[in-house]
Structure formats: structure tokens, C-alpha cells
Amino acid sequence: MVAYPEISWTRNGCTVAKYPEISWTRNGCTVSKYPEISWTRNGCTVSKYPEISWTRNGCTVSKYPEISWTRNGCTVA
């Protein structure tokens, strides 16, 4: 399921496990370490990263080819 080998997270609110530069909680994905990615806690609203685009409803990736997940709590595919 995980296309990106350096990023690993669960299906419940996106729990990062392997990527050292990205850190967020399980409640709506709160970024704390990656300076180029910024989003709110309500369904992950990207505001700075041009290559990643998703909606506010559970994180819908639309531009990043190596990362794909559904709107229900971020399911990596």
C-alpha cells in the first residue's frame, strides 16, 4: 500500500512513523517539522507545498504521484 518507502503512517488520521522531517498528530494531521508544508487541523489544508494538493475532507491527494490516499482518515495507496 505504501508507495513512498520513507513515509509510513496508519489509516487513522495519518500517523507518520518513518519520515524524520514530517511530524503531525492523529487529530487532523498537525504538521510540526516540515517548513514547506502548512495546513490546518481540520482535514489537512495545504497552503505552501505546490506539489501536493488535497481537499479539506480527510486529505485527498491530487498532484503527488507517489502518495495516494482516500478521504477517510488518509489511507495510503
From Swiss-Prot:
Q: Major place of localization?
A: membrane
Tagged with keyword Lipoprotein? yes
Site note Not methylated applies to 14, 29, 44, 59, 74
Q: How does it sit in the membrane?
A: Lipid-anchor
Gene Ontology MF terms in the entry: pheromone activity
Could you tell me which residues are lipidated, with the kind given as S-farnesyl cysteine?
14, 29, 44, 59, 74
Keywords carried by this UniProt record: Cell membrane, Lipoprotein, Membrane, Pheromone, Prenylation
**GO terms under cellular component:** plasma membrane
Where in the cell does this protein reside?
A: Cell membrane
User: Any chance you could tell me the propeptide residue ranges?
Assistant: 1-3, 15-18, 30-33, 45-48, 60-63, 75-77
Function of the protein: Rhodotorucin-A is a mating pheromone in cells of mating type A of Rhodosporidium toruloides.
The name on file for this protein is: Rhodotorucin-A peptides type 2
Q: Which organism is it from?
A: Rhodotorula toruloides (Yeast)
Source taxonomy lineage? Eukaryota, Fungi, Dikarya, Basidiomycota, Pucciniomycotina
Identify the coding gene. Answer: RHA2
